[in-house]
Amino acid sequence: MLEELNAKEKYSFNKLQKRLRRNVGQAIADFNMIEEGDKVMVCLSGGKDSFAMLDILMSLKASAPIHFDLVAVNLDQKQPGFPEHVLPEYLTTLGIDFKIVEEDTYAIVKEKVPEGKTTCALCSRLRRGILYRTAQELGCTKIALGHHRDDILETLFLNMFYGGKLKSMPPKLVSDDGKNVVIRPLAYCKEKDLVRYAEVKAFPIIPCNLCGSQENLQRQAIKQMMQEWDRRFPGRLETMFTAIQDVIPSHLLDHKLFDFKSINRDSGIIDGGDKAFDPPELPKAPLLDIDEMDMLDVIEVR
């Protein structure tokens, strides 16, 4: 599709491509996601996000100041209608190391989950276990997942509204089995950017609902809420994402994170003190993602 773009569309896509590369590079640097000598297992589901993650990581690898290896891994869960040929053919054309793991988790899920109920939770747990095992077999030091900024915010709201926790998706963590380090290189990337990137790149997308299951109602409601906010209040999601990167425990209520009991008159003013009755200090404009590429000359996309 790239060759079908006109000059204006190519300019726009060039900005998008640079923005996504910058976002991924910044996340990797901020959280020390990839280090010298790492072997990164890139989990490829066949969706837009994992395709984009692989594409961007391959691009960054070519110019990175450190050496690391990539291996793409797809789990064929034997869902009815899964096009087995698509990913091997695509990955072969890229010239990247890859492995297709075949495990009939679909049969297990259909046996365990009542008809009409969402299978996503059990399917996800089974998939994680297989991927963790595969990472060990391949000698991988990091496992890269394709969750993006919107996934992180959705999870934050799900935990707040339905779980009573201020908790989201970490950009980097130790896996459930304690043997793997999991990273999310797309943590700073907007979903709408990834959608457009996948469209232009014409990735061979495989639907994620071949099993017939759908997201649970709570996640659907959160997604719709965020889409409405983004439409009606431009910049709100950007501001909220900035907020979870600037947490002040002394101004929350979790005594496990801050020692409120020890505070006395000699403690001094902590983190600005109590400004509850002061006029709110709000920015004059939303914290929009201003792209410095707007100020540069047009660069031809080849």
From Swiss-Prot:
Chain ranges for the short sequence motif PP-loop motif as given in the UniProt record: 45-50
Pfam family, one: ATP_bind_3
UniProt-listed InterPro entries: Rossmann-like_a/b/a_fold, TilS/TtcA_N, tRNA_Cyd_32_2_STrfase, tRNA_thiolation_TtcA_Ctu1
GO cellular component terms listed in the entry, alphabetical order: cytoplasm
Main location: cytoplasm
GO molecular function: 4 iron, 4 sulfur cluster binding; ATP binding; magnesium ion binding; sulfurtransferase activity; tRNA binding
Pathway the protein takes part in: tRNA modification
GO biological process: tRNA thio-modification
Catalytic activity as recorded in UniProt: cytidine(32) in tRNA + S-sulfanyl-L-cysteinyl-[cysteine desulfurase] + AH2 + ATP = 2-thiocytidine(32) in tRNA + L-cysteinyl-[cysteine desulfurase] + A + AMP + diphosphate + H(+)
UniProt keyword annotations, A-Z: 4Fe-4S, ATP-binding, Cytoplasm, Iron, Iron-sulfur, Magnesium, Metal-binding, Nucleotide-binding, RNA-binding, Transferase, tRNA processing, tRNA-binding
UniProt-annotated binding residues for [4Fe-4S] cluster: C120, C123, C211
Listed EC numbers: 2.8.1.-
CC cofactor note: Binds 1 [4Fe-4S] cluster per subunit. The cluster is chelated by three Cys residues, the fourth Fe has a free coordination site that may bind a sulfur atom transferred from the persulfide of IscS.
Family recorded in the similarity comment: Belongs to the TtcA family.
More info: The thiolation reaction likely consists of two steps: a first activation step by ATP to form an adenylated intermediate of the target base of tRNA, and a second nucleophilic substitution step of the sulfur (S) atom supplied by the hydrosulfide attached to the Fe-S cluster.
Role played: Catalyzes the ATP-dependent 2-thiolation of cytidine in position 32 of tRNA, to form 2-thiocytidine (s(2)C32). The sulfur atoms are provided by the cysteine/cysteine desulfurase (IscS) system.
Assembly description: Homodimer.
Name of this protein: tRNA-cytidine(32) 2-sulfurtransferase
UniProt organism field: Aeromonas hydrophila subsp. hydrophila (strain ATCC 7966 / DSM 30187 / BCRC 13018 / CCUG 14551 / JCM 1027 / KCTC 2358 / NCIMB 9240 / NCTC 8049)
